[in-house]
Amino acid sequence: MTDKENGETYLNKYFVPYLPLILLIIIAGVISYYRLLIQMDIGPISDTCDFLLNALYFSGQGVGYYDWTRPVFFPLLIAIVFKLGFVSATAAYVVDILIYIFGLIGFYLLLSLHFNKIESFFGGLLYATFPIIILLSGLGFSDFTCGAFVIWAFYFLVLAVKENSKFFILFFLFWTMAFLTRFNAALIIFPVVLYIFMNKQEIKNHKYIGWGILASFLLIIPVLWFYQIKFGNILFPFMDTFGATSRTFSPEYHPYNVDPLFYIKGFFSYTGFESFIITFLIIIGIAVYTIIRVKNQSDIRNKLLSIVSKEDMNLKFKLLIFAVLTLIFIVTFGQVHYMVSEVIFLAVGLVFFTLINELNIKNIDLHILVFSWFMAFFIFNSVYVIKSSRYFILMAPGVAYLLLLGLRTVFNELTVKLKKGNLIFPVFALILTVFILLSTASLLPSIEDRFQGIRVTNEKIAIASEWFINYEPDYKNKVIYSNLWPYLAWHLKTDVKIMFTFKNNQAYLGGVKDNTTFTQQDNLASNNYLVDNNADYYFSSDAINLTSYKPIKQFGSVIIYERI
């Protein structure tokens, strides 16, 4: 064999099979690079500052301010970069982006368990270019890190069930890392239980489930010990997080939204026009396919009669239970605690699988797993009264998978009898890929405009901090309060206390929807709170009348008050 033939064999064996994945990584890498440059100009957001300050502590450079109600895993990853000497907000952006791309690789591999390489590439690109993904990637939030670990956890779960039970160890480790990144990752217990039930006969060696659980405990024990030291209660952060889901919030609180259809209404703004096109084609395809099938009335009639006329009472009972549970889920959705809805939907999934399993649909268990994954987070975030577009991030992989599945199924059914029908989907995917890339190119320049307020806030706080350090050289020994506390603590590198927003005899953490109409009683409540806590200085984004404090400097909307 010649050197040329050896080279071609090497390329065909080791390079060509991975070309779609490599291309996907390159595209995502280029998009992420430009997104990083934009974020470096915008600066950190409030939550990012919390992660950065926690990371300073873990790197041995703590400044006195921490928020230990936030899970520790993401700050620990940032702390590794800090230990290498790169102490900057950019560290959080880079870690966020790198793990997001790591998650994208896992998503491609998960897709490849059912789809071919071209389809998996397209599904990965679809997920990577959802407007909500591009908009929020690189912010230095923990959502993408959690999402990446969840993706890999599900990938290893499928491998553990279908190929080698040893993968259960990796499944539990990634699930634990996801949980320690965002506590609501615990919700994947529902799709996991459903998937294991669907494949209970296929698990070859149950002992590796035990080994996986043990590995998870070894990973989580240091964190529990840390919480014991900080709070005197190893469960406090978990209780605080999940307790908030049952807490009553005032409608004045700015993220408050009781609409259970919040994420459905914003669906196409999160997923982009390309998802609208795909959804439209899926609906049209189903309609056309139904019309074609209905023409063959005898075929339809025979199938219906074969189901209805069966003397299988067990089947009829399952159909009845499925219908009742589905109706209960729909009627009670948004009216009961999210955990009730999660359990009802799990029951719906279990009954549905027992009904459809006899049809021998290829990888139906995988499709149900992904759908239940999406629903686990959709139910929780829709019922929880505190809503944010960023919470859609953990639903996005499931959406991309289901859109790809629907599109591929429709194309297969409608083109199966066409000559060269197998080329129609790749051609369509290529056209839509070009459209997606053009849309992404037009979206990137607009991101900075969307975060203009954050950029200005960072600029003003940086200037105010520099001025204040010169004005009060002993500032680290002063008691400082602010309603912009994470920003200020990061810029001053010192402890800054949380200042609540007082309105209508209530205290709000993080502001209110209407911050323009404060009464004298509201101002008095703010003043008394500062006095009672011996505040020397107060940095505020709101102009308020404080009887015990005077404004000494203003930078844009940032006002510095000093105690009289």
Give short role names for the model-derived ranges:
Residues 21, 173, 217, 314-326, ...:
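Signature aromatic-anchored transmembrane alpha helix within multi-pass, membrane-resident enzymes
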Residues 56, 143, 178, 187, ...:
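Hydrophobic/aromatic-rich transmembrane helices and adjacent perimembrane loops
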Residues 426-488:
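Membrane-embedded, lumen/periplasm-facing catalytic core of multi-pass transferases
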Residues 46, 70, 132, 138-146, ...:
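Short acidic/glycine- and proline-prone juxtamembrane loop motifs at membrane-interface regions
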Residues 112-118, 153-168, 178, 359-360, ...:
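Membrane-interface transmembrane helices that cradle and orient dolichyl/undecaprenyl
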Residues 3-6, 159-164, 175, 188-220, ...:
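Perimembrane helix-loop-helix junctions
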Residues 31, 50, 207-289, 296, ...:
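Membrane-lumen/periplasm interface segments of specific transmembrane helices
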Residues 469-507, 535-541:
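Short periplasmic/luminal acceptor-recognition loop of GT-C membrane glycosyltransferases, typified by
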